[in-house]
């Protein structure tokens, strides 16, 4: 594996981890009825950004799914 490939894999793992963490935090806020708070909306924006990155990876054949 080249250095570039290793860095890509690290970045992909970071994005997947962040996506899972943001999703979990959103679920907790939603369960508490706090889905209209600024914190929830900020998490939603982060989740959508991460999701768009993952979709680009998928569209270019770099990952199968997330």
Please place each PLM-identified region on the residue numbering.
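Extended, charge-rich alpha-helical interface modules
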Residues: 1-66
